[in-house]
Amino acid sequence: MDTTNRTTLIIDGNWLLMSRLGMMMGDFVNTLPAEYLEKAKNEMIDFVAQSINKIINYWGPRIDNIMMVQDGGSWRKTLPKPALITEEYKGNRVADEEIAWNYVWDALKTLCHNFEVNHITCVTEKNIEGDDWCWYWSRYLNHVGINTIIWTSDADLKQLVQRDPTTNAWTVWFNDRSGLVVNEAEQHSDMDMLLNFDAVDPFLEQICDRVEHLTYINPDNIVMSKVICGDQGDNIKALIRVEHTTNKGKVRINRVSEKEWNKVKEELGIKTIEDFKHNKERIIQHLRMLPRFAECKDSMGDLLDMFDYNMSLVRLHKEQIPREFQLAMNKHKDEYLITDLDYLRNNYKVLAAHTEPVEELFKDLPF
């Protein structure tokens, strides 16, 4: 197997910022003086930069470039809603009014500007989510023979793990705590390797050996599960829901569970996203036959519309992302820059203890 060692780390910028904000929330209370908030903003920038540089050093020579993506709004919020939906996509996310968000977003803006100044790719575009960018860059870079590691905690992005059939470049998902997620097609038994040694990618094996936790998945399962079972975090509703009243008079909503969906999926032999798309009526019929959903009164037409709507919200693919936004992203392909990672590594110092002030994170860089 002809493979490539060129590997770019794609940083989910919004996730990285928000995950670090969780540790500094008290420093961004909007009743604090402006000078204190400005200081907190600069500390946030340093904290994020420190996290990035630690991950650069973690991967060492296994990566040779980095880039960051961020949200610019969401085209998904403009999609026509099916009859069974009244809620807004991600409409359940309410910003904490006690937080000075202008300082938080200014930290991200400043960080991205500093990336650009120092020849590090950082892209954003109106109405395009960071998830869309992860899809675009992973597919584009794989197509030109560059591997990608998506650094995030967003489980939706696990659907992007793949190997490009033309170039053999791959995409994997990584989180510091959860470990590495790889397409199950890369899992080889000892017998497989004996029979076809060329099937193994030595460089990907090095990537896998670097982490403590390694998981192989069918990426299509990420999409199928969320389309059927929904996601309360993103305010995506389960495909089939039935209200019922308990003995105590409380109204509950039965939703399709992962266990129920896995059973139906196995019964119907659904293994790929193509199976999923071509059998949606059969899937709905089987789900409605489950005892908990016997009282479902929704029409097949409405449920099919709901199925397609959820697919548009969940699936990161050229079939789902509107062409105008694909073209908008493609205009940025020439903004892919090659970063001098050795320079970043060599100009970074980590103190052994926290008893002294932290030195500049990128010694000569404005982070």
Predicted regions and their residues:
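Compositionally biased, intrinsically disordered low-complexity regions enriched in proline and serine
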Residues: 71, 90, 95, 102-104, ...
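Short, basic and Ser/Thr-rich N-terminal targeting/leader segments
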Residues: 62, 151, 307-309
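Noncatalytic, basic helical substrate-engagement surface that gates or grips nucleic-acid strands
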Residues: 2-148, 157-183, 187, 315, ...
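Accessory alpha-helical DNA-binding modules that contact the DNA backbone or grooves
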Residues: 204-325, 354-359
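Short aromatic/hydrophobic-glycine micro-motifs
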Residues: 117-120, 270, 350-353
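Low-complexity, acidic/Ser/Thr- and charged residue-rich accessory regions of DNA metabolism proteins
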Residues: 1-4, 44, 302-307, 312-367
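Charged/polar, solvent-exposed surface patches and flexible loops
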Residues: 19, 50, 54-57, 106, ...
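Long, highly charged, low-complexity intrinsically disordered interaction regions
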Residues: 126, 137-254
